[in-house]
Amino acid sequence: MNPPNIDYVFWPASVRRYSFREHVEAAAAGGFTSLAVAPETYRRAISSGSSVAELRTIADDNGVKLRHLDSLTDWAPIRVPSEVNPELRERFDISADECFAICEALGLETILAVAGYDKGVISSDVLIDGFGRLCDRAAQSGLWVDLEFMPFWGLPDLAAAWAIVDGAQRENCGIMVDTWHFSKGTPDFELLRSLPGHRLVSVQVADAMKHQRGSTLFEDTVRFRKFPGEGQLPVVEILKILHEKGHLRHIGSEVFADEADELSPAAAGKRSAESLGRVLEAAGIPRSEPELRSKAGGFSERRPA
């Protein structure tokens, strides 16, 4: 059995062109229970004149918990890949100190650790040590750390991520399974089934066509993802495996796509929720309360006292 209260996470890829306020609006429109916040989103909000109190009030007023940091690369000696677009450079080239300060300011509960280095440039011993140190620091603040693999950079697949998590042997960490990265890289279903469930508590859900549409895998992932259930990837099968392990706590939609960029925040949030709901139902994952839903009523905003 999975935990009774699943956290439905809005990873704001589908509203990447918008500000923090619109990210909250999208999450609320879809009835998501929490929001992931990128360091650069926080930076921009603060530099535009918003206070931390105002950001937290906006989220609270709309029933959206600020819970996840997306993302941190400063656990490894290299935090930015050699070839990356300006948007991701802005996200990745941020110190661990700043990331932890953001977590403290917003009251976040989890950190998404990403490999911002190229394949084969850092030894496994260095990576295991660096990840372990990150987990130790996170544990001091009661934070959970998920390690995400991506097929086009230095941590390409589930096996590589498991080698680090298993090698680090920390209690407050696991692996983020992104259905796109898993399917487009080395989709090892046997390994996925064999891993301990307590290390697989989080999943990001996105779909795609089986064939590569972009000139590179990276272009494919940032331009041509599809909403869950609208493509050809084995999304439901992945979700079934994770659900059967009984430890899923965080389930979220993450759709980077040119198509999604054309949607309003509210429309993106609702479509994310509706499409995610359909694949969860197909995977036999029961809805928990508060139920993922399209929210009635408009976006709420007020200034803190």
Q: What feature does the model see in each segment?
A:
Residues 45, 79, 121, 211-213, ...:
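Glycine/Thr-rich phosphate-binding loops of Rossmann-like dinucleotide-binding domains
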